[in-house]
From Swiss-Prot:
Cofactors demanded by this protein: Zn(2+)
Alphabetized UniProt keyword annotations: Metal-binding, Ribonucleoprotein, Ribosomal protein, RNA-binding, rRNA-binding, Zinc
Functional description taken from the UniProt entry: Binds 16S rRNA, required for the assembly of 30S particles and may also be responsible for determining the conformation of the 16S rRNA at the A site.
GO molecular function, one term: rRNA binding
Gene label: rpsZ
Family: Belongs to the universal ribosomal protein uS14 family. Zinc-binding uS14 subfamily.
Protein name: Small ribosomal subunit protein uS14
Subunit structure: Part of the 30S ribosomal subunit. Contacts proteins S3 and S10.
Source organism of the structure: Campylobacter fetus subsp. fetus (strain 82-40)
Amino acid sequence: MAKKSMIAKAARKPKFSARGYTRCQICGRPHSVYKDFGICRVCLRKMANEGLIPGLKKASW
C-alpha cells in the first residue's frame, strides 16, 4: 500500500506538467498503471479473475 501522504501529493497539480504521473485508483501503486482502466496490474488481475471487469477474461490457448 502507498503512503497516504504520497497519494495526497500525487493528487495535487504539479508545478510542471511533465512531473505528473498516474497512480492506481484502488491501492495507490505508482508503477504499471493501465491508463484504460486507471488501476495497476495487480488490482487489474485480481478484479479480472473475480469477473468484476466486463469483457476482460484470462487468455487461454
